[in-house]
Amino acid sequence: YSISDDIDTHGFTNTYQISSEFGDFTAHSNEMLYKLIQEIMAINELEKFKATPRFAEAVKASALSPFEIMESLIIDPADTVSGLPEDIEKINLDMLEMTSREKNVHDKKHKHDLAKFAAHKRQLAYDLNVDVYSTNKVLQQYLNSVGWATYSSDQAVPVSLEPLDSINFTKDSHRLHNLLRDKTPEQLHKINAKYLTEMGIDKTVIEAFFANPWLTPRYETMVVGELYSQGLKGGLNEYIGLVNTSSSEQDAFFYQNITKLISHYLNNTNESQVSIEIINNFAVLKVRKHYVIPILIDNGYWSEQSAKTINNFERTSRGDGGDVIQILVWISGEV
């Protein structure tokens, strides 16, 4: 792959244009760039595997499958992707979800096979350190074709990659990644709904959370999982409401990483009375008489309005009637 030298910059947020033999891509922010490069590297690993005799043998074995739709996953996975119902495509091609709604699939054994394939695909994505719910259709095509061919022929895929992204620093990150590998979307939904209820989130907020098409099972699980174990004393309902405003994948990715940053701060403080306050669409931690502002430095921009917002916040919180004695800024990212 190659990254264009022509980088559009809005404050600290860079927008990159990436060219590769697998297509052209755009990444907003450095962290999204790492995610995209990881996906391109994963596609390349899968492409190399598809050129091996092992894959050719797997394709022959998969021809014994009773599902015509599965054959298309290997021959022309792009057509399979574009033909999906819209409400299924938005959760990013988990195969159990994708095929269980096909009218002609009723046989229990077939459903069992599809469930096993879904698990195989999640394991493949896990080994490559990519998001199985990614909106990258090229990645999905490769995961589908290689995943089905090797699953149906009972072959392991000898590929793996180390992660590039830098925001995996919380104690819960490894556990949550394992959860995403081991659980179906339905199981993740039940777990996340249970945790949100136990955290005291309003029913209407929970419903909006699960109804947001940009909050895939991955983003839902990372946000809920990072918050659940922290014991925050207030503001969670408002914070989930803020996450619900996500109107793009970039928004969902941003809130996932902000939540990780909040969790990282809480893991490194002994404070027990911490709450979240939403101020001008900023999530701010209130720690006794301190405010802590978590910022992803390469995922924001500075403007005159931003400066006024921060100045007003500082003036009102520290001025007459304010009880704040210190404001801290907790930063992640690079410029």
Q: Over which residues does each language-model region extend?
A:
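Membrane-engaging insertion elements
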Residues: I88-H106, L164-K203
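Catalytic cores of nucleic-acid endonucleases
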Residues: L296-V335
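Active-site beta-strand-loop-beta-strand hairpin of nuclease catalytic cores
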Residues: N281-I293
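Acidic-basic catalytic patches of nuclease active cores, encompassing PD-(D/E)XK
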Residues: K190-F282
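Membrane-active amphipathic alpha-helices enriched in small hydrophobic residues
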Residues: V59, A63-P66, M70-P77, V81-L84, ...
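Long, contiguous hydrophobic alpha-helical segments, chiefly transmembrane helices and signal peptides
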Residues: Y16-I18, P77, A125, P294-I295, ...
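Cationic, glycine-rich low-complexity segments
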Residues: Y1-E102
